[in-house]
UniProtKB/Swiss-Prot annotation:
GO cellular component: cytoplasm
Function: Ligates lysine onto the cytidine present at position 34 of the AUA codon-specific tRNA(Ile) that contains the anticodon CAU, in an ATP-dependent manner. Cytidine is converted to lysidine, thus changing the amino acid specificity of the tRNA from methionine to isoleucine.
EC class (word): ligase
Family according to the record: Belongs to the tRNA(Ile)-lysidine synthase family.
Keywords: ATP-binding, Cytoplasm, Ligase, Nucleotide-binding, tRNA processing
Protein name in UniProt: tRNA(Ile)-lysidine synthase
E.C. numbers: 6.3.4.19
GO molecular function: ATP binding; tRNA(Ile)-lysidine synthase activity
Length: 289
């Protein structure tokens, strides 16, 4: 039986370089994106190139043109570029699994941003496993704190670069990261445990509802949906989208319910090129290129 193979996203930072070191025998191809946004970008690219060569792992480097016009939300635009490259590599190597190096500090950072924004999420933080853009995503480092990863890098003599912009409060995520950096180990642990407890409650409610609503999920009739209490409607719409590998926030689900109620609009945009529509009183997805 062939070994499980992955595409791996490697930036050159300690997290992803350790991922490359520990999983290189299972990696079909590494993808590195050079955004040309900072002076050390080429340094990180060369570091990834040299380490992939040393470990004998195929590498695809995507260089974003220097004259690229970046939108206000750079991080969202950069993420889209990354995943487009992951998809291309996955198609080329006929692999549907993606390895990413998010760790527990990333988890609490994401959860805090969600809570600070008062977003009603169906999951807080970052999932260890999930599906995005048609790929099965695995994040094996969620169980490790950042300082543990740095210690492992030293232990395994893993080279890495530090993105100096992470310390600059130029993005909301960076500001949250700096705030969390001042927390004690006990404060981080307490926050993490609290978020996990919230996720368990949400998951239990969702599991219970899905057991009762299998028939609706198979035939998502909007008239039947409206017979459920509003909290259940939100969970059902979320379940419908998750079965189609589309993950959205609680706020977006509320907007979807608003779209469903009057039947005034033809389509609701979920993500790039993916739209929600109502056909014969049933929810359906449209994919437009």
């Amino acid at each position: 039986m062939p070994k499980t193979q992955y595409i791996a996203g490697v930036s050159g930072g300690p997290d992803s370089m350790l991922l490359l070191k520990l999983y290189h025998k299972k990696i079909a191809c590494v993808v590195h994106v050079n955004y040309n946004k900072r002076t050390t970008a080429l340094r990180d690219q060369k570091m990834v190139e040299e380490y992939c060569k040393q470990l004998k792992v195929p590498l695809i480097v995507h260089t974003v043109p220097e004259d690229t016009v970046w939108k206000k939300n750079f991080q969202a635009q950069a993420r889209k570029i990354r995943f487009e490259q992951f998809q291309k590599a996955a198609s080329l190597y006929k692999v549907d699994k993606l390895l990413l190096a998010h760790h527990r500090d990333d988890f609490i950072e994401q959860a805090k941003m969600q809570l600070d924004a008062r977003k009603r999420a169906m999951y807080y933080g970052i999932k260890t496993r999930g599906e995005l853009y048609g790929m099965k995503v695995y994040r094996p480092f969620i169980k490790y704190w950042k300082n543990e990863i740095l210690a492992l890098c030293e232990e395994h003599k893993v080279p890495y670069g530090i993105d100096e912009t992470n310390a600059q409060p130029i993005y909301k995520r960076n500001q949250v990261r700096q705030e969390i950096a001042n927390w004690s180990k006990e404060e981080k642990e307490e926050f993490y445990i609290g978020v996990c407890a919230m996720n368990r409650v949400i998951g239990q409610k969702l599991f219970s509802l899905m057991k009762r609503a299998k028939q609706w999920l198979a035939h998502p009739d909007v008239r039947e949906l409206k017979r459920y209490p509003l909290p259940d409607q939100r969970q059902l719409v979320y379940s419908f989208l998750i079965t189609h590998h589309i993950d959205v926030t609680g706020d977006k689900i509320d907007a979807i319910l608003d779209f469903i109620q009057p039947f005034q609009q033809k389509h609701y945009r979920l993500k790039d090129e993916i739209f929600l529509s109502i056909k014969d009183e049933r929810l359906t997805l449209l994919y437009k290129s």
